[in-house]
């Protein structure tokens, strides 16, 4: 066996990495090894790219200031709500201030209507006055009171 030859295929050529292979379109296999390919660099003038970056940054800053001003306005207008809630509603509406105000107004209206239906106090011992559960609980109470005798307990 020749030195540097492979046991499985003694006629195989050495491996050439893909990055060093070049295809010229001519020849049998189309590859020429270890040839440098010409590189082309395209660049924009620095002044225009710097100006474009500054414009994008300024636009983002203006947008951020607009969002902050809208949220501050909403916080003042709807002082009973948290900043997180207002921000969530604002972002859910895609930054639309008018839609956010409308949604928060509806939230205030519905929250005051629901408070009117709440009882003054809530207690675990409160029994619902509606449905068949009331009649069952009164029947159970009546049956348990009649079963227990009033006999004196001796010590």
Curated annotation (Swiss-Prot):
Overexpression of CID5/IPD1 leads to increased ploidy levels and longer hypocotyls in dark-grown seedlings compared to wild-type. Promotes polyploidy in dark-grown seedlings. Regulates the endocycle leading to hypocotyl elongation. It comes from the Eukaryota. Contains a PAM2-like motif, which seems to be involved in the binding to the PABC/CTC domain of PAB proteins. Coiled coil: none annotated. Gene3D superfamilies: DNA helicase RuvA subunit, C-terminal domain. Residues 66-109 form the CUE domain. InterPro entries: CID5/6/7_CUE, CID5/CID6, CUE. It comes from Arabidopsis thaliana. A motif (PAM2-like) lies at residues 7-17. Residues 114-155 are annotated as: Disordered. This is Polyadenylate-binding protein-interacting protein 5. Residues 130-148 have a biased composition (Polar residues). One of its GO terms (molecular function) is ubiquitin binding. Specifically expressed in immature siliques. CDD domains: CUE_CID7_like (cd14371).
């Amino acid at each position: 066996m020749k030195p540097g030859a492979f046991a499985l295929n003694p006629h195989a050529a050495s491996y050439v990495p893909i990055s060093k292979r070049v295809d010229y379109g001519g020849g049998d296999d189309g590859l020429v090894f270890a040839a440098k390919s010409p590189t082309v660099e395209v660049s924009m003038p620095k002044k225009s790219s710097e100006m474009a970056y500054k414009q994008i940054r300024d636009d983002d800053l203006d947008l951020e200031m607009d969002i902050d001003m809208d949220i501050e306005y909403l916080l003042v207008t709807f002082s009973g709500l948290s900043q997180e809630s207002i921000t969530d509603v604002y972002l859910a509406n895609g930054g639309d201030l008018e839609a956010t105000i409308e949604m928060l107004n509806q939230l205030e209206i519905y929250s005051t209507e629901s408070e009117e239906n709440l009882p003054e106090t809530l207690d675990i011992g409160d029994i619902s006055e509606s449905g068949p559960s009331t009649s069952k609980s009164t029947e159970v109470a009546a049956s348990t009171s009649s079963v227990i005798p009033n006999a004196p307990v001796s010590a």
